[in-house]
A protein has these predicted regions:
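Membrane-proximal helix-turn-helix segments that form the acceptor-binding/catalytic region
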Residues: 110-114, 140-171
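Short alpha-helical donor nucleotide-sugar binding micro-motif in glycosyltransferases
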Residues: 293-299
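Conserved acidic donor-binding segment of nucleotide-sugar-dependent glycosyltransferases
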Residues: 339-340, 344-352, 360-366
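Aromatic "clamp/platform" in nucleotide-sugar-dependent glycosyltransferases that forms part
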Residues: 307
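A short, active-site helix/loop in glycosyltransferases that binds the activated sugar's phosphate group
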Residues: 44, 154-194, 202-204
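Short hydrophobic beta-strand element within catalytic cores of glycosyltransferases
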Residues: 324-327
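A short, glycine/small-residue-rich beta-strand->loop->alpha-helix junction that serves as a flexible
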Residues: 8-26, 97-101, 230-233
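Nucleotide-activated donor-binding/catalytic signature segment of Leloir-type glycosyltransferases, i.e.
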Residues: 266-286
């Protein structure tokens, strides 16, 4: 009889299937033989009943009219998720949760009460800098009313996180730096023997079937993929950089949905730089991953100047097609570039460093063919078929 693997992801949407919270349930089913399920409110109403062996359990969000003015309203909205968990906890062998958080605590608490022998796996989706900042707030003495209330809020969150840790059987961290820092304790709670370094990966079951273009076949394309215009993705830095560069025979493709706040910025940018309209192309969101992979396959260079990332899955996908990656110094930058061996790490928000590196690419100062070969060799470390075996070894 197959074991059941359930991932709770309240706002899961179709495009997330290619991300870690979609890939892990898929590969747990395809490679390890689990009966995988994802429990969600299907907020965008875009999910099938089944995808690659993963069953989507879609429940209605309760009290949707409530705003999140208090923490209890968030819990109230999850009523139907809690209801499903209460009814089915005994039949769930492995419960996968995202983030060490107060919300994860309540899922874990209910699950362990009803199925004490069940296995809880928390994928941290972890940003070390954010954790250190939050923990400093919790640990320090407030110097103002504002700091007092902020500490009170963070302390309430961390009190539940501390109670979550003992219930958890396994916590994985995406970057080696985060893993080394967190492997023995979380907020002072012992985690020895229950942590794992597990980077995010790429869907090699699909990508390995695609003929990757040779370095010579690729086009002079610089690519970025993500939620364009959000504060995290720092798209404005990329555009401000590009207007300072002679792109020559290169083009830049920006793939992804555009944040509403960024639309006017984009329009003004092209009004002020009309010569770049044919050089810088916004494609819009591409939900069909096979279509998205065509862009990776055409491109030589992938750039992601984010202000923060827990990992940056799109960079690993780009590497699977031999792209030279230029990334800001976010959490997993060293893991992805093999400590700058196959890619370039620039300072966050540094237009000067980004200009310099892109100019080196365009002037052929960087041997992209050599980087291409090294990248394709290194990226095998991020195949999900390999990563899932590593995870499976730790789940009893």
């Amino acid at each position: 009889m197959k074991k059941t693997f359930l991932h709770i992801s309240e706002e899961f949407e179709y495009t997330w299937l290619g991300k870690d919270n979609g890939m892990i349930p898929i590969y747990m089913s395809e490679k390890l033989g689990y009966e995988s399920k994802i429990l969600t409110v299907n907020l965008k109403n875009d999910l099938p009943d089944n995808e690659r062996g993963v069953e989507f359990i879609k429940v209605k969000r309760k009290f949707a009219f409530l705003s999140n003015f208090a923490y209890w309203t968030k819990l109230a909205k999850r009523y139907n998720i809690f209801k499903y968990l209460i009814r089915n906890a005994k039949n769930i062998d492995v419960l996968m949760l995202f983030h060490v958080s107060r919300c994860s605590y309540w899922y874990a608490y209910i699950y362990k009460k009803l199925n004490p022998n069940g296995f809880i796996y928390v994928k941290a989706d972890f940003n070390l800098a954010v954790y250190q900042k939050e923990w400093n707030i919790v640990s320090s003495k407030p110097k103002s009313f504002r700091e007092f209330f902020r500490k009170r809020r963070e302390s309430a969150e961390y009190n539940k996180r501390k109670k979550l840790i003992p219930m958890t059987d396994l916590i994985s961290y995406e970057s080696l730096e985060a893993y080394e820092f967190m492997k023995d304790s979380y907020a002072g709670i012992d985690t020895k023997g229950k942590t794992l370094y597990l980077p995010n990966g790429y869907d090699n079951e699909i990508i390995d079937k695609i003929k990757v273009k040779t370095s010579e076949e690729k086009e002079n394309i610089i690519l970025t993929v993500g939620r364009l215009g959000t504060e995290a993705k720092n798209t404005e830095l990329l555009l401000e950089t590009l207007k300072e560069i002679d792109l020559k025979d290169w083009k830049v493709y920006l793939v992804g949905s555009i944040d509403k706040s960024f639309i006017s910025y984009k329009e003004n940018f092209f009004k002020e730089n009309p010569s770049l309209i044919d050089k810088i192309i916004f494609t819009g969101e591409i939900k069909d991953r096979k279509e998205l992979y065509k862009y990776y396959n055409r491109a030589k260079v992938f750039v992601l100047p984010s202000r923060w990332e827990s990992f940056g899955i799109v960079m690993v996908e780009a590497m699977a097609f031999g792209n030279y990656v230029i990334t800001s110094n976010t959490c997993a930058a060293k893991d992805i570039t093999n400590n700058s061996e196959i890619g370039k790490i620039v300072k966050i928000d540094s237009k000067e460093e980004l200009i310099k590196e892109l100019e080196r690419v365009i002037s052929r100062e960087i041997n992209l063919k050599e980087k291409y070969e090294k990248t394709l060799n290194y990226v095998s470390n991020f195949k999900y078929s390999n990563l899932i075996e590593k995870l499976g070894e730790r789940i009893r």
